[in-house]
């Protein structure tokens, strides 16, 4: 069958570099700058930089379960810094699981933050916290990551948080510990270079929120419907799904849709 032959992997060719450039552009355009006090971003080219967070080395670049694909390329943020000749300290700070905090990793991260002009903290939701086949029970960030952020901010006030998450997390409970907050979502295979471009000022972040970020999970009307019964959930808010509820009832939010 000629059609099947034409569609086979063996006979299919594409430009890997051009493919990666499209992924890079999509990543750059999707990031949302939530906070930038004291113009901490972009990072100056001669700044002493410390990078904290396992996501910087092991990026969560896509969703889990049946959405998983094998990328043609994969460059972490740390790799992107190396390619650009940026000399930065790195400390993982935590493990990408739901296990309790590792005091040794926390202490290493706090020590690495000392004396830095800017600390880039890569925080977010590991795949164990959000993926296919189960529901999240909270909008909060993992407690061990928040504790680490507080410890680092107590040592160095020039903290920028880079979020890696597939869905909304509450920001208000910990925002005071960061001068800058960049929502980067799950950035795909070219997320590392895209983050380097945005954080160091080659590209200005211009993404807009496709979701509302509430102050608290209980501010969302859908909360009372969860978890439903026998696998079924009644959307009791009716037409007032998402931002429509907040707009209609003038409910204050942390960051609005759009």
List where the protein language model places each region.
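Short, surface-exposed polybasic-aromatic patches that bind anionic ligands, especially phosphate groups
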Residues: 3
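C-terminal non-catalytic regions of proteins with extracellular/luminal or membrane-system context
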Residues: 7-17, 21-258
């Amino acid at each position: 069958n000629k059609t099947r032959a034409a569609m086979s992997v063996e006979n299919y060719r594409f430009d890997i570099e051009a493919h990666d450039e499209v992924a890079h552009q999509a990543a750059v355009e999707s990031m949302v700058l939530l906070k930038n006090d004291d113009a901490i971003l972009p990072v100056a080219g001669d700044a002493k930089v410390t990078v904290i967070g396992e996501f910087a080395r092991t990026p969560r670049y896509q969703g889990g379960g049946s959405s998983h694909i094998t990328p043609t390329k994969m460059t972490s943020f740390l790799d992107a810094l190396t390619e650009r000749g940026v000399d930065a300290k790195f400390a993982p700070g935590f493990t990408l699981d739901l296990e309790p905090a590792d005091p040794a990793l926390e202490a290493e991260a706090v020590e690495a933050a000392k004396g830095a002009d800017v600390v880039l903290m890569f925080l977010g939701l590991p795949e164990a916290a959000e993926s296919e086949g189960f529901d999240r029970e909270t909008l909060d960030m993992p407690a061990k990551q928040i504790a680490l952020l507080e410890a680092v901010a107590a040592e160095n006030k020039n903290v920028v948080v880079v979020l890696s998450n597939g869905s909304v997390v509450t920001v208000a409970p910990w925002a005071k510990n960061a001068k800058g907050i960049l929502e980067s979502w799950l950035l795909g295979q070219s997320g590392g270079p895209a983050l380097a471009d945005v954080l160091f000022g080659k590209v200005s972040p211009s993404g807009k929120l496709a979701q509302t970020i509430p102050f608290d999970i209980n501010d969302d009307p859908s909360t009372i419907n969860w978890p439903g019964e026998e696998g079924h959930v009644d959307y009791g808010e009716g037409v007032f799904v998402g931002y429509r509820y907040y707009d209609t009832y003038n409910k204050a939010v942390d960051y609005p849709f759009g």
